[in-house]
């Protein structure tokens, strides 16, 4: 399973003459409803402020605390209008989880030249600041909530979150040493630990064979495993060979 922190973004709400804050609130609701419809397990921020949107530092601090408490696996940043790029970047940097950027398609301006949002430009701005913060992110193509690309992009992102979560908590069992001819299987144990916190647990072959002999002599555990294999797998060898 993957838990995603969904945090809708809006330009500073005090600048209502630039983009429509009410429409941003409306679209954040539509986006949350679509996530629920798709069965996405996400943490919302409706309790952070009245709009349930990120637009200032005070809100960012509360959101970070909540997402840390919930132990989210990924950060979804839907831009309901332009977005507050530096707050998005600060939050993503602090949480250190995979980040997904997305925004709806921009509508055409009305007869007075007024636009409800400028999501595309906002995504460019947020992406640029994220790169300056050295925060990797995934950009999902601007689309409507019911477009197939929206669901596919979310599913792909959740798969990435699961991979990253597993990778960060990985421990590798190394049985004996690498055979001389197997140069493709060599690894740098120190680099794995220093860069990725991945631990290797080496087991010498004599210790492994001794434990195998003890288990075979005792018999109980081996019998359970053989029975399980017979019940759940297609076995094409004899019992003594299976042992």
Segment roles from a protein language model:
Residues 1-5, 9:
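Single conserved hydrophobic/aromatic residue that forms the stacking wall/gate
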Residues 8-9, 224-243:
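Active-site loops and adjacent core secondary-structure elements that bind or stabilize anionic groups
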Residues 32-52, 136-142, 198-203:
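Short beta-strand elements in bilobed, periplasmic/extracellular small-molecule ligand-binding domains
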Residues 52-168, 181:
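Cofactor- and metal-binding active-site motifs of prokaryotic enzymes
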Residues 194, 199-218:
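Terminal amphipathic helices with adjacent charged low-complexity linkers/tails
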């Amino acid at each position: 399973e993957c838990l995603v922190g969904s945090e809708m973004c809006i330009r500073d709400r005090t600048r209502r003459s630039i983009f429509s804050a009410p429409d941003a609130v409306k679209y954040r609701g539509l986006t949350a409803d679509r996530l629920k419809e798709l069965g996405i397990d996400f943490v919302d921020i409706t309790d952070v402020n009245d709009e349930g949107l990120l637009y200032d530092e005070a809100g960012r601090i509360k959101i970070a605390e909540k997402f840390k408490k919930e132990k989210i696996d990924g950060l979804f940043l839907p831009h309901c209008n332009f977005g507050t790029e530096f707050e998005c970047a600060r939050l993503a940097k602090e949480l250190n989880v995979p980040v997904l950027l997305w925004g709806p398609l921009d509508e055409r301006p009305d007869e007075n030249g007024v636009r409800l949002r400028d999501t595309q430009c906002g995504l460019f701005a947020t992406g640029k600041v994220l790169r300056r913060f050295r925060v990797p992110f995934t950009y999902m193509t601007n689309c409507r909530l019911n477009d197939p690309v929206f669901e596919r992009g979310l599913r792909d992102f959740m798969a990435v979150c699961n991979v990253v979560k597993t990778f960060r908590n990985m421990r590798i069992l190394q049985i004996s040493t690498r055979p001389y001819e197997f140069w493709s299987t060599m690894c740098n144990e120190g680099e794995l630990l220093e860069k990725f916190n991945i631990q290797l647990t080496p087991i010498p072959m004599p210790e492994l064979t001794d434990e195998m002999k003890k288990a075979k002599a005792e018999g109980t555990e081996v019998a359970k495993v053989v029975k399980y294999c017979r019940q759940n797998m297609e076995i094409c060898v004899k019992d003594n060979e299976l042992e």
